[in-house]
């Protein structure tokens, strides 16, 4: 495998300059695309492809508790890296992806956790050094090579960033060997026992006020291990004064923004010094690599004032570097169809967009589950709640599953334990048809196109694309294939890969599916028809998309624009003419969909 990848890397390097010239149209114009024009492919680099075995241990020596490397354990580094990702760019491009969302690539604390419960920072969310690439994933040159190779192919690069916390370095003397309960501002004020005289609290967010916050021991007695006293970068991050230091969050009330996320050092993002510091950190990555967007981890756990400063600063920084359509989307995790919660973070926090967790839940309920298709009205009718309304909703990244919640195929099997392999495949394809054709920006989670299902959430949903050595991955039954995760899973003939590639091509070829206004046409209070029209913004012509979430054939009349008379099939069987002006008949097989494009008005 290593020599094959090396050859692929050499060929990619040799053709890079030619790509700028010969396939240059996409490469020259990718900056002009709006966020809703993209198809996004998301992966954790450690689990994608191993292009350089020399960096598997991150330059460290010792066992897995020192290096973090153990390819047989689902909670440690497995060897994937930036060189491997670069070598597989053509695979991603052939799928139809136009942007790559790269899991965090910053230097992480290799291993953390209580004795016997240690795991590694393979996922990228335990950062110690915000200024360099994790040595397990490669070098700055590897990052530059990846970004340049993606851009040469007309593909954008989105970085996954964190401002809420760092790795777990700070400890509290009161609870050295256990979880430290959250201590509130009311019970443990900043000026407790005469500390920090004159400090007016974190709600007065001025440099003058925070200059009076000099002692971090207001809630707990803070300590930092000597071996880690200078482990963080930039160096200012090593001072505990820049952190909340109040113990673990309980994910509600003030602890949601001020508590340590499962022990991780929670940054005091109310402090202007922290705000300025992170604007400088992430602005530097834009300057250095010309990346095209940021996914913001744990965005809901950071105070709104931080985002009100950070977001505009990043957009301005990107624009100054010739990146006019920089895409920022925050993680506001929810397991409900709670559009109000998501929208609040675009209005109060001023985040440009957020990941559409409500969309994922709606598809889960209707396609994996058996909820009525009226579920989608709860989702789309509330698009007006977002700052900017439906225009913002068009730019929300939509998804079906991810590395935290789990994979969509897993949800399908959990909700349909007696379903045949064919039914599971049909439900997974139907869910992705919704993902690619309904409003929003579709995000594919790496491995979904190869039928990965996983055993659940988090570590159980982070399988390797390259041959895995994890037993609990390799015993999984994949969807649409006889392969297992013990194999290399980059099969472009896989039925899910082919289905997604076709959907991506349809989406990218039809502006109605990227920039078009969406009109809900039909829905039911049971499994069955859900239909929408997407309107081409240039021609005004509609594309009718109709889904059947039931296990029976359905024939229904769908309301259409009275000017729409003739139709052509983009997918499935479409009647060539309307029944009568304003009414179009569709027949849809079980767990299937049709896409019918109206011609010129008669």
Regions of interest found by a model, annotated:
Residues 32-39, 46-284, 288-289, 310-319, ...:
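Substrate-binding/active-site clefts of carbohydrate-active enzymes
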Residues 393-421:
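Active-site clefts of carbohydrate-active enzymes
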Residues 44-47, 106, 134-137, 163-165, ...:
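Short, flexible loop/turn elements at secondary-structure junctions
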């Amino acid at each position: 495998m290593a020599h094959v990848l090396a050859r692929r890397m050499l060929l990619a390097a040799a053709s890079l300059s030619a790509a700028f010239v010969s396939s240059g149209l996409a490469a020259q114009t990718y900056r002009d695309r709006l966020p809703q024009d993209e198809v996004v492919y998301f992966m954790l680099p450690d689990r994608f492809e191993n292009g350089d075995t020399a960096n598997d241990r991150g330059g460290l020596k010792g066992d897995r508790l020192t290096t973090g490397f153990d390819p047989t354990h689902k909670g440690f580094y497995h060897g994937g890296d930036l060189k491997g990702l670069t070598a597989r760019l053509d695979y991603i491009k052939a799928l139809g992806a136009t942007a790559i969302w790269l899991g965090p690539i910053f230097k992480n604390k290799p291993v953390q956790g209580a004795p016997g419960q240690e795991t590694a920072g393979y996922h990228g969310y335990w950062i110690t050094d915000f200024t360099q690439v994790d040595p397990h994933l490669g070098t700055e040159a590897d990052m530059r090579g990846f970004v340049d190779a993606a851009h040469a192919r007309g593909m954008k690069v989105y970085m996954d960033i964190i401002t809420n916390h760092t790795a777990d370095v700070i400890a509290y003397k009161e609870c050295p060997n256990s979880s430290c309960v959250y201590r509130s501002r009311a019970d443990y004020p900043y000026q407790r026992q005469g500390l920090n005289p004159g400090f007016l609290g974190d709600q007065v967010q001025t440099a003058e006020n925070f200059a009076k916050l000099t002692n971090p021991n207001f809630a707990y007695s803070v300590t930092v291990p000597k071996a880690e006293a200078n482990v963080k970068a930039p160096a200012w991050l090593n001072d505990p004064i820049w952190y909340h230091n109040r113990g673990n969050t309980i994910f509600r009330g003030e602890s949601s923004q001020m508590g340590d996320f499962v022990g991780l050092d929670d940054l005091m993002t109310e402090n202007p010094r922290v705000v300025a510091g992170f604007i400088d950190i992430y602005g530097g990555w834009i300057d250095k690599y010309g990346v095209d967007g940021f996914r913001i981890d744990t965005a809901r756990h950071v105070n709104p004032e931080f985002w009100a400063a950070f977001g505009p600063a990043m957009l301005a920084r990107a624009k100054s570097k010739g990146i006019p359509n920089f895409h920022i989307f925050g993680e506001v995790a929810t397991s409900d169809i709670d559009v109000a919660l998501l929208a609040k973070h675009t209005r109060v926090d001023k985040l440009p967009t957020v990941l559409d967790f409500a969309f994922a839940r709606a598809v889960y309920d209707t396609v994996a589950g058996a909820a009525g298709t009226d579920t989608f009205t709860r989702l789309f009718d509330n698009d007006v709640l977002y700052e900017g309304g439906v225009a913002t909703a068009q730019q929300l990244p939509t998804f079906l599953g991810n590395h935290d919640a789990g994979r969509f195929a897993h949800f399908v099997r959990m909700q349909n334990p007696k379903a045949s392999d064919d039914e599971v495949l049909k439900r997974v394809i139907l869910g992705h048809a919704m993902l690619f054709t309904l409003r929003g920006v579709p995000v594919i989670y790496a491995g979904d196109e190869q039928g990965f299902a996983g055993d659940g959430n988090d570590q159980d949903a982070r399988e390797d694309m390259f041959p895995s050595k994890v037993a609990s991955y390799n015993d999984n039954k994949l969807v649409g294939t006889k392969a297992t995760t013990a194999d290399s899973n980059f099969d472009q003939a896989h039925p899910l890969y082919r289905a997604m590639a076709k959907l991506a091509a349809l989406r990218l070829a039809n502006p109605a599916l990227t920039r078009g206004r969406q009109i809900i046409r039909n829905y039911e209070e049971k499994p069955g028809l859900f239909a929408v029209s997407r309107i081409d913004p240039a021609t005004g012509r509609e594309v009718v998309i109709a889904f059947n979430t039931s296990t029976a054939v359905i024939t229904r009349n769908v309301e259409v624009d009275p000017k729409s008379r003739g139709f052509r099939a983009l997918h499935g069987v479409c009647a060539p003419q309307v029944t009568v002006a304003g009414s179009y008949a569709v027949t849809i097989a079980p767990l299937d969909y049709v896409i019918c494009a109206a011609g010129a008005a008669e």
